[in-house]
């Protein structure tokens, strides 16, 4: 079983050019929309409609991606302006073949989360993004916040799981068991962007 303190966190980078050479082989999440969100609420702030998260990602990736690196593109699955297939095609064109559902609705709970789910802007949309990416040959990571979500992610063939920041020890134990069925295992979101 993993506790939050022993589970490896996945670094979040906002600028690929600033990625140190020694990080080329370590699993990293690229999310340019996290730039300037140094506080601990970055995972919910990045969901706000104050920027075009996927355009910022695609713009950063157009600068070049090392194909052998373990950089996973943080794709906002709830993008109201782009279809998943179009985002994935743009990633492919940029030479990126790794995707994670981040920013993610896992940062939201309560009535807001239920409303998003009711309108089709929830976990279902995120799983559809990952499912489509896998079908197109992408390696994927899934940010998860429930056993059911983790179970579905593993069933569709994700390469690894990332525990949402609010995951408790019982959830981490469940995720850890499921992550044994993946090639990359289990990570956690960091406490802050740039933190571990």
UniProtKB/Swiss-Prot annotation:
Task: Cite the Pfam families for this sequence.
Answer: PEP_hydrolase
Tell me, what is one Gene Ontology molecular-function annotation carried by this entry?
A: catalytic activity
Q: What is the superkingdom listed in this entry's lineage? A: Bacteria
Kindly give the InterPro entries that the UniProt entry links to this protein: Aldolase_TIM, Pyrv/PenolPyrv_kinase-like_dom, TIM-br_IGPS-like, Tobamovirus_resist_UPF0261
Disulphide bridges in this chain? Answer: none
Q: Which UniProt keywords apply?
A: Plasmid
PANTHER family reported in the protein's UniProt record? UPF0261 DOMAIN PROTEIN (AFU_ORTHOLOGUE AFUA_1G10120) (PTHR31862:SF1)
- Official protein name in the record: Uncharacterized protein y4oT
Q: Which organism is it from?
A: Sinorhizobium fredii (strain NBRC 101917 / NGR234)
